[in-house]
């Protein structure tokens, strides 16, 4: 139960990608439907059964993450001008309502990588999840139509 809740929170954090807009081929544009290809929380692999039922949708400055039938919605704010690129995710509806998570992201074609700090205390500085932290590292693949 605790693992499922952490998974929901984690996925809904990553759903936190900000206003992308613009050229869909730009590495700064993260609009689309994204499915987690792999993920780890606190340095440990994320449960496969949860990964398979998770979906992140980003549309402009809005996100929606669904884990099974548990939706989480909110807004994202991107800062692509810094390295690594930054993402602020704020929940507006669901289990993360009124919570803000700081993250970093990078996109390469149809692959999006996001590292979230689920403690909500600081922004990750690298794409790494280590034991004893609440860092959630997810590699997403864009869902094809």
Predicted regions and their residues:
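Bacterial N-terminal signal peptides
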Residues: 5-15
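Chalcogenol-based redox active-site neighborhoods
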Residues: 22, 41-42, 139-143
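Contiguous, well-ordered beta-strand patches that form the walls/edges
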Residues: 35-51, 59-126
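N-terminal helix-cap/turn-to-beta initiation motif at the start of protein domains
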Residues: 20-35
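C-terminal partner/receptor-binding element of secreted or periplasmic proteins
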Residues: 131-145
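N-terminal secretory signal peptides that target proteins for export/translocation
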Residues: 1-2
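Preferential activation on post-signal-peptide N-terminal prodomains/segments
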Residues: 30, 45, 124, 141-142
